[in-house]
């Protein structure tokens, strides 16, 4: 077992990644790099004498069960023509390793978070339109049930509305118990969730990208999307939640407005209100873990810094109740 506090973790995982790739692809490894990116998993980039370029992503011990669904979901998305990593193996049937893992071909590109500051207006527009198109296509994948997915095709709960309600009240309890937010903000959240959803979802049982943030979106030099990565925390439910989850992290940034304007479908007032509702959902789901370190052992930022979009979402929801 590898502990996240072990100073030699990068060395141990580089060694494990090399072994996995050599056995999986029957080749010799030339170089292994421990990537200092991502907060929920450990990533190694492995290059071989046969010009293979592979990412081995290790799940921390308390997230080991993710391997039971993420590789299959990635393959399902890939086969549907979506720009996601193509898995070539994982720890369920592949070579042994200290932690559960998925291995996939490296995707060229840099994160949108890194490239956006240097993009001119044209490339920002290209990125906004292409990202909107990619995310809109995600809702074509159906998920049986609701809430956290447990396989590539099914989620844990039966009712989306019940899942959302339970998650929100659980998050509120954590906020109160651990004093994660200012009392006035906590009271406002409680009033909003007690009033109930601003509308009812017209569509459910669709894939929701629960890991959406600009650090999980790869772009080319011209601004076009080259890959959507990290699908470990996806949900089944109202596809508008993907927009709400994005708004929680990036809703206060100018590019988010450009992205929203590029959305292929005109959104009604009720749908805009639901997006704000799902922004609150992401914040409250994170609240259940905000007092704990990340699965990788790194400390978390304060909740309101992680999800600044909660403030404008609350304003909107408060105004309609």
Positions of the model-derived regions?
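A short, local hydrophobic-aromatic micro-motif
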Residues: 30, 85-88, 226, 244
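An alpha-helical support segment within catalytic cores of ATP-dependent transferases
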Residues: 8-28, 123-124, 129, 137-210, ...
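ATP-binding pocket architecture of kinase catalytic cores
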Residues: 32-158, 184, 202
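Phosphate/pyrophosphate-binding loops and the adjoining catalytic core of nucleotide-dependent enzymes
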Residues: 1-4, 74, 318-321
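Active-site Asp-x-Gly
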Residues: 205-208, 213-273
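Short, surface-exposed alpha-helical segments at coil->helix boundaries
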Residues: 14-15, 71, 253-257
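Helix-rich C-terminal or lid/interface subdomains of diverse kinases
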Residues: 129, 244-321
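Short beta-strand segments
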Residues: 57-59, 88-89, 150, 207-210, ...
């Amino acid at each position: 077992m590898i502990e996240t506090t072990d100073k030699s973790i990068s060395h141990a995982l580089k060694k494990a990644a090399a072994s996995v790739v050599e056995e999986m692809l029957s080749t010799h490894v030339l170089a292994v790099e421990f990537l200092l990116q991502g907060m929920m998993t450990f990533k190694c980039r492995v290059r071989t004498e046969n010009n293979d370029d592979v990412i081995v992503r290790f799940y921390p011990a308390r997230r080991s069960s993710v391997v039971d669904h993420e590789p299959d979901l990635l393959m399902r998305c890939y086969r549907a023509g979506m720009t996601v990593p193509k898995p070539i193996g994982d720890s369920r049937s592949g070579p042994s390793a200290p932690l559960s893992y998925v291995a996939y071909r490296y995707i060229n590109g840099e994160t949108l978070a890194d490239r956006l500051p240097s993009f001119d207006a044209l490339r920002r527009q290209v990125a906004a339109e292409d990202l909107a198109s990619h995310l809109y296509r995600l809702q074509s994948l159906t998920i049986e049930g609701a809430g956290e997915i447990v396989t590539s095709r099914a989620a844990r709960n039966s009712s989306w509305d019940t899942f959302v309600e339970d998650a929100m009240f659980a998050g509120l309890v954590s906020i109160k118990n651990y004093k994660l937010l200012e009392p006035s903000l906590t009271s406002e959240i409680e009033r909003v969730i007690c009033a109930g959803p601003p509308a009812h979802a017209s569509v459910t049982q669709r894939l929701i990208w629960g890991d959406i943030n600009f650090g999980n979106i790869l772009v080319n030099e011209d601004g076009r999307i080259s890959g959507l990565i990290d699908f470990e925390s996806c949900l089944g439910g109202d596809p508008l939640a993907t927009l709400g989850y994005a708004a929680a992290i990036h809703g206060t940034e100018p590019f988010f407005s450009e992205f929203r304007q590029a959305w292929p479908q005109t959104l009604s007032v009720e749908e805009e209100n639901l997006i704000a509702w799902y922004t609150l959902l992401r914040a409250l789901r994170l609240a259940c873990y905000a007092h704990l370190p990340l699965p990788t052992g790194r400390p978390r930022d304060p909740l309101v810094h992680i999800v600044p979009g909660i403030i404008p979402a609350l304003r909107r929801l408060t105004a309609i109740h």
